[in-house]
């Protein structure tokens, strides 16, 4: 056999023999140790001396060192660090909305990237409870007496997070019949008050949704066309059911139809919406709800794909905050049973009352599924409007955002 011609000597290839220890070891040692020349090093950059020495066991200070208190402190400090990062991301998103940079749709990538990061962090925080669950109730009881009157309710950052997202003060469950801010003093109280006065993420998103292209009555007029199509569709549905022979099945279908009709037509009752808004059962303005539903229906259009992702991430934040509360409730129930909390609250009973839609901020986005209709009921677009939804709006002067939001 002549063998492979490409390996022949006639081609002039000369292969070096392979070594067992080879050149890989040499390459792995080819770098330069820059740290030996001085300058910033890892520990100094992260200020690890402060971070790693910030665990003071109260049990040890009282002369009775309890092993699991260290885990308890580390876990809660990790929570607070992640809360700080969430607030950092949330503030940057709010600033983009606040300064009008979101009018340039190219900035929406920043918004959804940072909101996605918030979602991923919250997923981590929900899972982190499993670490605390490695501690038994008896283990916790060994050092619990040293914690009072400290309480998780006193987490300033978590309360700031609630306020900045948009939890309504009127819907908060009172803490021992007192306003939640009464548990904070001095600068902390001032920060909470300031966060209540600032525009929330909910309010900023609401204003953004109200500007959804296609809502203009003298333009595409999505809302007017949707109402017309739904009324027509309901009439056709009624005619189909009415034409059937009398039977128990027909009665059931007619009853279901009446329910569907009431729900869908209520969508166009602005006074009813305002009434539900005043009761806290709805959070978005009537026009913002229209914008959200339009994005929901036309989410496959290029211009609405990114806005739809944002609405999805906002719902994820709400869901994960609820899961976090629920996991917290379960952990407290496991550790304390029905005993009072270290801060003096009713413990499990109080926490359980916070796992509800009262603390959901973007509840209207979840409820959009209530108004799903057959695709052929959704208003069709003419070529001009369809082309319009392929074109993003941008403004060079607003594209360059401030340093803080970069």
Swiss-Prot record:
It catalyses: L-tryptophan + O2 = N-formyl-L-kynurenine. Binds 1 heme group per subunit. The modification Phosphoserine is found at residue 19. Substrate binds at residues 72-76, 144, 342. Its EC number is 1.13.11.11. Gene3D superfamilies: 1.10.287.3810, 1.20.58.480. InterPro entries: Trp/Indoleamine_2_3_dOase-like, Trp_2_3_dOase. Keywords: Dioxygenase, Heme, Iron, Metal-binding, Oxidoreductase, Phosphoprotein, Tryptophan catabolism. Heme binds at residue 328. GO terms for molecular function: heme binding; identical protein binding; metal ion binding; tryptophan 2,3-dioxygenase activity. Its cofactor is heme. Pathway: Amino-acid degradation; L-tryptophan degradation via kynurenine pathway; L-kynurenine from L-tryptophan: step 1/2. GO terms for biological process: L-tryptophan catabolic process to acetyl-CoA; L-tryptophan catabolic process to kynurenine; protein homotetramerization. Pfam families: Trp_dioxygenase. Homotetramer. Dimer of dimers. Belongs to the tryptophan 2,3-dioxygenase family. Heme-dependent dioxygenase that catalyzes the oxidative cleavage of the L-tryptophan (L-Trp) pyrrole ring and converts L-tryptophan to N-formyl-L-kynurenine. Catalyzes the oxidative cleavage of the indole moiety. This is Tryptophan 2,3-dioxygenase. The gene is TDO2.
């Amino acid at each position: 056999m002549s063998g492979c011609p490409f390996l022949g000597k006639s081609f002039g290839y000369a292969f070096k023999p392979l070594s067992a220890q080879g050149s890989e070891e040499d390459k792995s040692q080819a770098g330069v140790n820059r740290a030996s020349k001085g300058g910033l090093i890892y520990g100094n950059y992260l200020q690890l001396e402060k971070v790693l020495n910030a665990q003071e066991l109260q049990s040890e200070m009282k002369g009775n060192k309890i092993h699991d208190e260290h885990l308890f402190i580390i876990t809660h400090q990790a929570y607070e660090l992640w809360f700080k990062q969430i607030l950092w991301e949330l503030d940057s998103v709010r600033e983009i909305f606040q300064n009008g940079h979101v009018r340039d749709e190219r900035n929406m990538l920043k918004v959804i990237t940072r909101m996605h990061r918030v979602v991923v962090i919250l997923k981590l925080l929900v899972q982190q409870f499993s670490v605390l669950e490695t501690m038994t109730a008896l283990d916790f009881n060994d050092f619990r007496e040293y914690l009072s009157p400290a309480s998780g309710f006193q987490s300033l950052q978590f309360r700031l997070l609630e306020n900045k997202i948009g939890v309504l003060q009127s819907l908060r469950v009172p803490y021992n019949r007192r306003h939640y801010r009464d548990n904070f003093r001095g600068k902390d109280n001032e920060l909470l008050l300031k966060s209540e006065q600032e525009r929330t993420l909910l309010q900023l998103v609401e204003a953004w949704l109200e500007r959804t292209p296609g809502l203009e009555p003298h333009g595409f007029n999505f809302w007017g066309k949707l109402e017309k199509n739904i009324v027509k569709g309901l009439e056709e549905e009624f005619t189909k059911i009415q034409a059937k022979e009398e039977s128990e099945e027909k009665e059931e279908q007619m009853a279901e139809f009446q329910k569907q009709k009431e729900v869908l037509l209520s969508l166009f009752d602005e006074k009813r919406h305002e009434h539900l808004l005043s009761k806290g059962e709805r959070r978005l303005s009537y026009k913002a709800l229209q914008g959200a539903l339009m994005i929901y229906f036309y989410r496959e259009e290029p211009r609405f794909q990114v806005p739809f992702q944002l609405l999805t991430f906002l719902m994820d934040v709400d869901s994960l905050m609820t899961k976090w509360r629920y996991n917290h409730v379960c952990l407290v129930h496991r550790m304390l049973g029905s005993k009072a909390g270290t801060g003096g609250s009713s413990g499990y009973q109080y926490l359980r009352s916070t796992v509800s839609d009262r603390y959901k901020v973007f509840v209207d986005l979840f409820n959009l599924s209530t108004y799903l209709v057959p695709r052929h009921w959704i208003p069709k677009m003419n070529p001009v409007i369809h082309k319009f939804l392929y074109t993003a709006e941008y403004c060079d002067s607003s594209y360059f955002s401030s340093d803080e939001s970069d």
